[in-house]
């Protein structure tokens, strides 16, 4: 059976749900797909809560771990939606997830207001460069007190302003559960939420004109066809049968040809910046590639090991370190989809860096990473984010 072609006639926007565990991110995602599939059935299918929440580890703990991808359309746009993990233990996925968003829906339970992970996710969204956040105030069916809702709204706006997001962003009152149960009033609230997404999340500025670059997130073997690497295209455009170079992490880069491109299980003739897709690589073995490498136009990008970065070190209250660090500090630097250990050299005259400080530092990585100025990274220790920065200068 020939696979359906992917429709590109509408602007394509990557979106996602972020927020505190149990505030209803996955329920909101399910409600959006259900309500849109009923209103615009020819363009949408409903994804059940369980289908979104489907990774096996999640079931035991009732928390979202893996990132679920769903798609839906409004009359104005096609959305690819990631349901980002909710639990602090899974921040690593949050970083890869949030990095795939042109805008985020921050889900806050009206019954609780902003919680520690709400703050953490907004901070992470800023670190990884999510350009816009709007708010779904969930569980509004459970709160009768208008003053209480107003108070929660004020807290949320303060939180957005703290991290330089638009404090006048739409805050839409919803009940995801009631919408899933078919309550008309709350179904309408989900449509209002999607209108707010259409109106407030700017059309993404795609980096289509730059040379092709896609960070590898995952690798699969398809029997009889070869190796497929998946990720979100960061820059440029790629046609079937184009030559590519796979570089970073390993000592040597390698060249191969892309023999197939898929998105949402549909065949594409080409992939361009912003697409989440899989690339079939000719003659490439699974062990030849790894997460964290990039697939790129040959010769367009070079891996580097030494750079200077401007870094914000999280305070203790933001979940960062409790103690200062010194010269020769060796944390992990999280670029795009992977951690690489690096050695930090502090500027002359700086003895130590305290949690909450901003600092410019020189870093030497133990493995090469394809980078250019402006690339963002997180600094992590044992799986928790302790800092965020961007590359200001490449030294080697």
UniProtKB/Swiss-Prot annotation:
Database matches in Pfam families: GTP_EFTU, GTP_EFTU_D2, GTP_EFTU_D3
Region feature (G4): 138-141
Spans annotated as G2: 62-66
tr-type G domain sequence ranges: 10-205
GO cellular component: cytosol
EC number: 3.6.5.3
Renumbered residue ranges of the record's region G3: 83-86
Residues involved in Mg(2+) binding: 26
Catalysed conversion reaction: GTP + H2O = GDP + phosphate + H(+)
Region (G5) location: 175-177
Keyword Protein biosynthesis: yes
KW Protein biosynthesis (keyword) present: yes
Localization, UniProt: Cytoplasm
Keywords: Cytoplasm, Elongation factor, GTP-binding, Hydrolase, Magnesium, Metal-binding, Nucleotide-binding, Protein biosynthesis
Main localization of the protein described in the UniProt heading: cytoplasm
Protein name from the UniProt record: Elongation factor Tu
């Amino acid at each position: 059976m020939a696979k359906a072609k992917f429709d590109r006639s509408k602007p394509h926007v990557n979106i996602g749900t972020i927020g505190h565990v149990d505030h209803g991110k996955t329920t909101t995602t399910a409600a959006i797909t259900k309500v849109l599939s009923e209103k615009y059935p020819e363009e949408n299918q409903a994804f059940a809560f369980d289908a979104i929440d489907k990774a096996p580890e999640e079931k035991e703990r009732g928390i979202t771990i893996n990132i679920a991808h769903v798609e839906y359309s409004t009359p104005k746009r096609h959305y690819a939606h990631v349901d980002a993990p909710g639990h602090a233990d899974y921040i690593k996925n949050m970083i890869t997830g949030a990095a795939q968003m042109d805008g985020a829906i921050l889900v806050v339970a009206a019954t609780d207001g902003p919680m520690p992970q709400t703050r953490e996710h907004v901070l992470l969204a800023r670190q990884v460069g999510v350009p816009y956040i709007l708010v779904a105030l969930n569980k509004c069916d459970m709160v009768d007190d208008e003053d209480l809702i107003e108070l929660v709204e004020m807290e949320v706006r303060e939180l957005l302003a703290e991290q330089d997001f638009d404090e006048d962003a739409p805050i839409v009152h919803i009940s995801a559960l009631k919408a899933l149960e078919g309550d008309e009033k709350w179904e309408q609230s989900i449509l209002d939420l999607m209108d707010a997404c259409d109106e407030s999340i700017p059309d993404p500025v795609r980096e289509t004109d730059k040379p092709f670059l896609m960070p590898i997130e995952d690798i699969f073997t398809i029997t009889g066809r070869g190796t497929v690497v998946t990720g979100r295209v960061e820059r440029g455009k790629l046609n079937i049968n184009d030559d590519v170079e796979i570089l970073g992490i390993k000592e040597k880069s390698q060249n191969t040809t892309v023999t197939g491109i898929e998105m949402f299980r549909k065949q594409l003739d080409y992939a361009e910046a912003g697409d989440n897709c899989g690339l079939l690589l000719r003659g490439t073995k699974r062990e030849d590639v790894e997460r964290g490498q990039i697939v790129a136009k040959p010769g367009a990008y070079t891996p580097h090991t030494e750079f200077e970065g401007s870094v914000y070190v999280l305070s203790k209250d933001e979940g960062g370190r409790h103690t200062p660090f010194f010269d020769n500090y060796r944390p992990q630097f999280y670029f795009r989809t992977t951690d690489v250990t690096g050695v930090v050299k502090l500027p002359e005259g700086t003895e130590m860096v305290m949690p909450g400080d901003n600092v410019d530092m020189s870093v030497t990585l133990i493995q090469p990473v394809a980078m250019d100025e402006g690339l963002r990274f997180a600094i992590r220790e044992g799986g928790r984010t302790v800092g965020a920065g961007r590359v200001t200068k490449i030294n080697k």
